[in-house]
Amino acid sequence: MFHRIEEALEDLKQGKVVIVCDDENRENEGDFIALAEYITPETINFMITHGRGLVCVPITEGYAERLQLEPMVSHNTDSHHTAFTVSIDHVSTTTGISAHERATTIQQLLNPASKGADFNRPGHIFPLIAKEGGVLRRAGHTEAAVDLAQLCGAEPAGVICEIINEDGTMARVPDLLQCAKQFDIKMITIEDLIAYRRHHETLVTREVEITLPTDFGTFQAIGYSNSLDTKEHIALVKGDISTGEPVLVRVHSECLTGDVFGSCRCDCGPQLHAALAQIEREGKGVLLYMRQEGRGIGLLNKLRAYKLQEEGFDTVEANEKLGFPADLRDYGIGAQILKDLGLQHLRLLTNNPRKIAGLQGYDLTVTERVPLQMPAKEENKTYLQTKVNKLGHLLNL
């Protein structure tokens, strides 16, 4: 049904367009993608005629800095945190909207001699800043476009356009397959691109391994660094996890207030302890402790969110009030650590369906969701109910 990544790369190198699909539990859409280096008015016209979506240009942070492309908004509350910059037109264009002038703007964006002053703001081309690390960090079309360009040896920038059906609905896989057949276009998935990159590179390094006796039992503690940021993560491993059988796994995001101080605002501490105890009872398993404080927003911002909750906002509203998505965690680094440990099939201790989708997008298989529900307390009843109502957590309250 889908083509190999190598086939798509060959077409992209020839200036052709490919279709890239993301996870059905994410945006569940397909985009036309081309290399910005080879963009032509004809390609732009094809995209806007048959794609019907917004034409955007994924770029690296370096392009944005060189051309002084500021974020479109100061607080990005998009559910997928797509990093739009201010839109632009090259100063040589007139209205900037024609296929020819949009292609001109893209070509000049890549021109190493271009400066920030060479572009009018706002305009008709929408640059998007890809996360460093690409789809291994964030499984989005923005990162896929830049990754594909880099794998082709081209300038690290792409041109993308969402594919919309003639009736105005989003094109899903059956529609995209028909489109690919109609125009003889290669079609790939971000999941396959992740798998392709994983075979060629890694972002995590196993640094040190020790024996760690705990109140719950004795574990092997393995420390990891990663090349994306300065965060250090730790995996607590129990028993022989190399048998190929599904392994009990808990991916636990750091919560200083709950894990260390016993905060009753959340259920993180009890979940951590219960997971360790359950892994000990099983005789084998992994607890992966990720330094993603406050669902990824950091300790101080989590405390600021708590302050807003004291003023009547719920946990999701507080994050959004601070300019963050409800959940800023990404699972790419965690997935790489689990893969480094030799895991493929997981019995995942979680109440969060998004965590399952997040890990499965990185070539891991969740064979079973193992509930990890803690008794609610008066102080966290509202918090837990919000996680059910707004974040889709599976809890019986």
UniProtKB/Swiss-Prot annotation:
Record GO biological process: riboflavin biosynthetic process
Known cofactor(s): Mg(2+); Mn(2+); Zn(2+)
Entry EC no(s): 4.1.99.12, 3.5.4.25
CDD domains linked: GTP_cyclohydro2
Disulfide topology: none
Taxonomy, superkingdom: Bacteria
Residue spans crossing the bilayer: none
Pfam families linked: DHBP_synthase (PF00926), GTP_cyclohydro2 (PF00925)
Residues the record marks as site: Essential for DHBP synthase activity: H124, E162
Sites where the protein binds D-ribulose 5-phosphate: R26, E27, D31, R138, A139, G140, H141, T142, E162
List of residues binding GTP: R250, V251, H252, S253, E254, Q271, E293, G294, R295, T315, T350, K355
Cofactor note: Binds 2 divalent metal cations per subunit. Magnesium or manganese.
Keywords: GTP-binding, Hydrolase, Lyase, Magnesium, Manganese, Metal-binding, Multifunctional enzyme, Nucleotide-binding, Riboflavin biosynthesis, Zinc
Function: Catalyzes the conversion of D-ribulose 5-phosphate to formate and 3,4-dihydroxy-2-butanone 4-phosphate.
Name the UniProt record assigns to this protein: Riboflavin biosynthesis protein RibBA
Annotated organism of origin: Bacillus anthracis
